[in-house]
C-alpha cells in the first residue's frame, strides 16, 4: 500500500507549488468574476478548487459549485436553502448538475470561468422553464 507523503516544511511546499497554481489560475480566469443578465446577477466567491459562484435570480438565491470533475447549480429562497438544495429537498428549491468538460479528476476544480458562467446561464434557463411549467 502506498503511503501518503508527509509535508514537513509547509512554507517550502507552498513555494514549490505556487508556480503551478498561478499558471492554472491564469489559464482558467478567462471571464469576469461578476456577470448579470435579465433578472439575474452573480459573483464568483472562489476562483478554483472549488469554482464557486453565488447570486440572485428572479427574487431567489442561486449557488454554483464545481469541484472534482462535477458541477452543481441550485436555487433556494435564501443562501442557505440554495446551498442545501444541491443535496436535499428544500421548499421551492431546485437543482441540476453535470460533469465538467475537461479531462481528469479535477476538471471541475479547475473549470474555466467561461464554462462556469455558461453552465449557470443554461441552468437558469432550465429552472425558469420548470417554474413556468408549474413543477415548482
Predicted regions and their residues:
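Cysteine-centric segments in proteins
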Residues: 2-136
Amino acid at each position: 500500500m502506498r503511503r501518503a507523503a508527509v509535508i514537513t516544511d509547509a512554507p517550502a511546499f507552498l513555494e514549490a507549488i505556487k508556480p503551478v497554481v498561478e499558471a492554472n489560475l491564469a489559464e482558467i480566469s478567462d471571464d469576469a468574476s461578476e456577470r448579470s443578465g435579465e433578472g439575474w446577477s452573480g459573483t464568483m466567491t472562489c476562483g478554483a478548487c472549488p469554482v464557486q459562484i453565488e447570486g440572485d435570480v428572479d427574487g431567489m438565491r442561486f449557488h454554483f459549485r464545481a469541484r472534482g470533475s462535477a458541477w452543481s447549480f441550485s436555487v433556494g429562497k435564501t443562501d442557505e436553502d440554495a446551498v442545501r438544495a444541491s443535496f436535499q429537498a428544500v421548499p421551492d428549491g431546485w437543482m441540476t448538475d453535470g460533469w465538467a468538460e475537461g479531462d481528469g479528476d479535477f476538471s471541475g476544480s479547475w473549470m474555466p470561468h467561461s464554462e462556469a458562467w455558461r453552465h449557470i446561464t443554461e441552468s437558469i434557463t432550465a429552472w425558469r422553464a420548470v417554474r413556468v411549467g408549474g413543477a415548482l
